[in-house]
């Protein structure tokens, strides 16, 4: 039960962070409070950091909000492709 509550809190913090209500540092401080400075806490903080760096909302090669494609159309006129969590203009996935 405690693991489910921790996961729910973590997902809630990620949702709030994506709305720009909180910044990465405050979420990582909450993780330290709730989970602690252990292996699981470090993993959770790494996920938060990776998602916070994600400027164009690319998740697992999927352009969730079409912001990658929109950015590339404005910048270079090419189609935008998500490579993991990175947006690349005019470079389709090769696998």
Curated annotation (Swiss-Prot):
It comes from the Eukaryota. Keywords: Antibiotic, Antimicrobial, Disulfide bond, Fungicide, Secreted, Signal, Toxin. Expressed by the venom gland. GO terms for cellular component: extracellular region. The keyword Disulfide bond applies. SUPFAM superfamilies: Scorpion toxin-like. Residues 1-19 form the signal peptide. InterPro entries: Long_scorpion_toxin_alpha/beta, Scorpion_toxin-like_sf. GO terms for biological process: defense response to bacterium; defense response to fungus; killing of cells of another organism. It is found in: Secreted. The keyword Secreted applies. One of its GO terms (molecular function) is toxin activity. Disulfide bonds join 58-82, 68-87, 72-89. Residues 55-95 form the BetaSPN-type CS-alpha/beta domain. Has antimicrobial activity against yeasts and bacteria. Belongs to the long chain scorpion toxin family. Class 3 subfamily. This is Opiscorpine-4.
